[in-house]
Amino acid sequence: MATPINPNDLDLTDRVVNINRVAKVVKGGRRFSFAALVVVGDGAGHVGVGLGKANEVPEAIRKGGENAKKNLFRVPLVGHTIPHEVLGHFGAGWVLLKPATQGTGVIAGGAVRAVLEAAGIRNILTKSQGSRNPHNVLKATVAGLKLLRSAEQVSRLRGKDVEPAKLAGEQRG
């Protein structure tokens, strides 16, 4: 297990991806509450996703931000892109993440874009299919990012030496 990331050591920015109003029907009518899906990141490889629920929107966003800070993880970066292609699944949704060359930009929509920008990824190609629910798309993106391994990590797992000239990610930016 990796060492936990202390959110106080990072300069985190948060971004609200989705706010959902939920109604509970009671004898006197409807009682509304809110659920906020929040992404936090430092733009340098650390990102977290959280869900906050409360009777008021600002409180739900605050709780979502706190929850996201508890779920921070590190994304291995090669320049401003990812080291290799990966497919993240969650529920009925899946997200394909492909590394891109310098100048491509973030080709992603909605929830996927929020996570990638918070992580500091500036050049990437994505495709999300299946579920269009922001919760499922967000969690599929996070699942994909957690599957990423740097060349150094793979070489350590395989017991091989890394030759700098053979790193495929060095041509990307």
Curated annotation (Swiss-Prot):
Keyword Thylakoid among record annotations: no
Domain of life: Bacteria
Gene Ontology CC: small ribosomal subunit
Cross-referenced InterPro entries: Ribosomal_Su5_D2-typ_SF, Ribosomal_uS5, Ribosomal_uS5_bac-type, Ribosomal_uS5_C, Ribosomal_uS5_N, Ribosomal_uS5_N_CS, Ribsml_uS5_D2-typ_fold_subgr
GO molecular function: rRNA binding; structural constituent of ribosome
Keywords: Ribonucleoprotein, Ribosomal protein, RNA-binding, rRNA-binding
Pfam family, any one: Ribosomal_S5_C
Gene Ontology BP terms: translation
Residues covered by the S5 DRBM domain: 12-75
Coiled coil: none
The keyword DNA damage is assigned to this record: no
Homology family: Belongs to the universal ribosomal protein uS5 family.
Binding partners and assembly: Part of the 30S ribosomal subunit. Contacts proteins S4 and S8.
Task performed by this protein: With S4 and S12 plays an important role in translational accuracy.
Family annotation (NCBIfam families): rpsE_bact
Entry remark concerning the domains of this protein: The N-terminal domain interacts with the head of the 30S subunit; the C-terminal domain interacts with the body and contacts protein S4. The interaction surface between S4 and S5 is involved in control of translational fidelity.
Protein's UniProt name: Small ribosomal subunit protein uS5
Gene that this sequence comes from: rpsE
